[in-house]
Amino acid sequence: MKKYALCVKTPMTYNAGSKAVIDATEIAISAGYEKMFYACVIPAFSNYKCTKYLIKLINLILCIFASLRISKSNQYFLQWPFPGRNAKILFRRLIHKQARITILIHDLNDLRGMVYPEDIQIMYPLFNAAETIIVHSDSMKDYLILKGVASNKIRILYTFDYLTDDMIVDRTFSRTVAFAGNLSKSKFLQDITIKENDYQLYCYGANYDGCNPGIVYKGKFSPNNVSKIEGSWGLVWDGTSTQACTGEFGDYLKYNSPHKVSLYIVAELPIIIWKEQALAKYITDRNIGIAISSIEEIPYKLSNITETMYQEMIKNIKSEAALLKTGSHLKRFL
């Protein structure tokens, strides 16, 4: 039996979302899988009309070639959502051949209110054909069971691995909070009011519009250079409100394991997380962070943390970081 990781040849960007996919592929390779490319992304040439058609043709050929190599006796690892116009060709071949399939879910668009009938038509037949499906949380598992996916094939990852050999300088307690991500979709940032001596909020990421003078914008960094993040805490929050995680992105946190959680862990930043977020219990049970009901609660929560309590969290988060940096979480299921 051979093992293949189905993947797109893609460049690294400043968006940590692509790092999650790239890291998972590298972890699969370290577990004995071989890469099988079914598509490629060539951004330097994609804006030229004459080359767009050539890229489409190349990707169609790659997908057909990969499909013809599918065998029932082999093991295939794929990551969902599965990009590429031609991916359905590959899915149907996997199902038809009754291949052994392991699926790692990064996002479920129907949980985000983004329902594409053509995706749903192939997604659940593919999930039902899979041998193993790796999800983010207990709530995501429950959702898939409600959709008819057998519970015995579902495994829970909780936190994504984050491959990096970046060295972190030991952190000390302060009232400085970091927030990393796509800042344009983090609408709650517009409404945060930070009083003097409450705390400082450092923001990292693309598309910041300077909407809040109380925020210190620190620019962006390569996802592999996590030591660039300053501060003592990492904030996990999303949506349109500071009172609760609301809206399309906020509601999704009840199911999702944001990649920024893993980023903060390997950066050795104890986490401040919404109490209803899917990973809140995971984080508080392991004493690697604190849970809040609203952004306004941050000053009160920080005022009750001592240096001793903080250093206990740092000790715990170092242990967790060591696992994520070596791909230990995903390897359990490969």
Language-model features, listed with the residues they occupy:
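Nucleotide-sugar donor phosphate/pyrophosphate-binding loop at the beta->alpha transition
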Residues: 108-125, 163
